[in-house]
Amino acid sequence: MNIRKKTRKIYIGNIAIGGDAPIIVQSMTNTDTRDIEATLKQINQLHAVGCEIVRLAVPDANAAKALKAIHDASPLPLIADIHFDYRLALTALESGIEGLRINPGNIGERKKVVTVVDAAKAHKASIRIGVNSGSVEKHLIDKFGGPVPEAMVESALNHIKILEDEKFYEIKVSIKSSSVLDTIAAYRMLSKSCDYPLHLGVTEAGSLIRGTVKSSVGLGILLSEGIGDTLRISLTEDPVEEVPVAWEILRALGLRRRGPEIIACPSCGRAEIDLIRLTKDVEACLVNEKTPLKIAVMGCVVNGPGEAKEADIGIAGGRDKGIIFAKGKVIRSVHGQDKLLNVFMEEVNKVIAEYNTTQ
């Protein structure tokens, strides 16, 4: 792991981004923003699973008008995703939205950009410049022969300069491609070229499995190199599925922890319990738990306690029985497979309570 690059600190609402702030988990609603009730429901669902900032699409004036009601009831800071019509950005800022995601170059003539920047200053809002490989300007595609990393970086730097020329520095930048390798290359170049906080993502990553793999590889490499201040896992799924993936990437790299880490063996012919079901049941019981414990679910009593000796608590199954252990030592035996989950969760809850009283 490389030391994380110290970028310029900005704020989205009360959330610090960059500098010495932790890496922040974001997502984006996929509801019709004009449907206030549905959008707030999804924002609350995202909040419940650990999302810290939410972006909303603002495609038209009616969506922009809905933002105030959404903002006023939202438990999280919000970013309005704006393209082409600068008036939507102004309405969003007047609604209290904490941040914008725009490309200054597609807002229109310079005076429109200046109007948006002045409004962002007045409302103490930040602006994310979001460059995607599919939206690189034609002259840069012609110059570089395609939407290659060099073209994306030059596009981002050009957009940054537009804001800097207006003395605006509350900037965050993203530079995404559907290609993992291009995404990595682009962020590496951009990180060397500016000190603004970077929002990481692989765009159009795909469905749950494919998108998780692509994002984990791409973002994991960048984060391990000290690059990145916020991240979003883009999945063709309910956005609630994105957030746990982001947290697991951060956990795997030792950057942040949220909730229990559940480790489980892959199962083999020695397993004498339904290990897959037991693991899923334990995960379901702890889905909303925030205590950062390590919990092991192992398939057999031969190797289970030893293999999971670093776990705070764990269970190893045998023929119609299970052994519960803590830090590798047996603390309780359970007879009857139908009792394993309930008894194990009793012990887990004791450990959680003990942990929380010592913090």
From Swiss-Prot:
Q: What class of enzyme is it?
A: oxidoreductase
What Gene3D superfamilies does this protein's entry cite? Dihydropteroate synthase-like, Sulfite Reductase Hemoprotein, domain 1
HAMAP family from the entry? IspG
**Record-listed [4Fe-4S] cluster binding positions:** 265, 268, 300, 307
Co-factor requirement: [4Fe-4S] cluster
Any Pfam family matching the protein: GcpE
Q: Which domain of life is it from?
A: Bacteria
Keyword check for Metal-binding: yes
A single GO molecular function, which one?
A: 4-hydroxy-3-methylbut-2-enyl-diphosphate synthase activity (flavodoxin)
Q: What is the name of this protein?
A: 4-hydroxy-3-methylbut-2-en-1-yl diphosphate synthase (flavodoxin)
* Pathway entry: Isoprenoid biosynthesis; isopentenyl diphosphate biosynthesis via DXP pathway; isopentenyl diphosphate from 1-deoxy-D-xylulose 5-phosphate: step 5/6
Which reaction is the catalytic activity of this chain?
(2E)-4-hydroxy-3-methylbut-2-enyl diphosphate + oxidized [flavodoxin] + H2O + 2 H(+) = 2-C-methyl-D-erythritol 2,4-cyclic diphosphate + reduced [flavodoxin]
Q: Which InterPro entries match?
A: Dihydropteroate_synth-like_sf, IspG_bac, IspG_bac-typ, NO2/SO3_Rdtase_4Fe4S_sf
Lineage of this protein's species? Bacteria, Pseudomonadati, Thermodesulfobacteriota, Desulfovibrionia, Desulfovibrionales
Tell me if Oxidoreductase is a UniProt keyword of this record. Answer: yes
Q: What is its EC number?
A: 1.17.7.3
- Which family is this sequence assigned to? Belongs to the IspG family.
UniProt entry keywords in alphabetical sequence? 4Fe-4S, Iron, Iron-sulfur, Isoprene biosynthesis, Metal-binding, Oxidoreductase
* Biological processes per GO annotation: isopentenyl diphosphate biosynthetic process, methylerythritol 4-phosphate pathway; terpenoid biosynthetic process
Entry function: Converts 2C-methyl-D-erythritol 2,4-cyclodiphosphate (ME-2,4cPP) into 1-hydroxy-2-methyl-2-(E)-butenyl 4-diphosphate.
